[in-house]
A protein has these predicted regions:
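Active-site-adjacent beta->alpha loops and helix N-cap segments on the catalytic face
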Residues: 91-101
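Active-site groove signature of glycoside hydrolases
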Residues: 75-93, 109-119
């Protein structure tokens, strides 16, 4: 992945080092594997490719956020500056408190915590994400916009343009076929409704 990022002309690479606990998921956990950690460190140096962020620090009631700490520590040692996360519950009081704990944990290692909204997740649109960032009131927490998901959430360019720059740290510039919003959301929700 690091080599491909370099060959494709990117300035940074992102690595998914926090497991999703999915069936058949490959193990890619440098925090638990000293050889893998050393190999990643060597590849970053060989290809002159800085590690920008790791993912995905999900906020869900069935996940223990303390499992993220070793991943944050390893990422910081590899030069990362950021963590990407998302929220998977509609319990606002709980997810706000828990997101604050994740942000504080990230800050221990000099990392910024970027929260992505998705129209079928717990934080579903730009305004909900901004509200969460405001409620947290921490200087290392930002809104993360994935342009594909933002479009599916009904976010417009004008809405983004009106949003103060302070909320944004980086974006995911993604594209793909865009079925009508309701069709897209209904299809995805049918697949993940038991997770929310």
């Amino acid at each position: 992945q690091i080599k491909i990022a370099k060959e494709a002309g990117y300035d940074f690479v992102s690595l998914r080092t926090i497991p999703m606990h999915l069936p058949g998921e490959p193990s890619f956990l440098p925090q638990d594997d000293p050889k893998l950690f050393a190999d990643i460190k060597a590849a970053l140096k060989e290809y002159d490719m800085p590690l920008m962020d790791i993912e995905l620090a999900r906020i869900r009631k069935d996940l223990d956020i303390n499992e993220y700490k070793p991943a944050f520590e390893a990422a910081a040692k590899l030069g990362a500056t950021d963590v990407l996360g998302s929220v998977w519950t509609r319990d606002r009081a709980w997810y706000t408190e828990t997101a604050g704990k994740v942000a504080d944990m990230a800050k221990e290692f000099g990392l910024k915590f970027n929260i992505e909204f998705l129209p079928w997740a717990g934080v579903r649109n730009l305004q909900e994400d901004i509200t969460l960032v405001d409620d947290l009131g921490r200087d290392n927490v930002f809104v993360m916009v994935d342009t594909l998901h933002a479009g599916r959430a009904g976010v417009t360019g004008a809405e983004l343009a009106r949003t103060p720059r302070k909320y944004f740290n980086f974006i995911h510039l993604c594209d793909g076929p865009a079925p009508e919003g309701a069709e897209c959301k209904d299809t995805v929700l049918d697949n993940i409704k038991d997770d929310l």
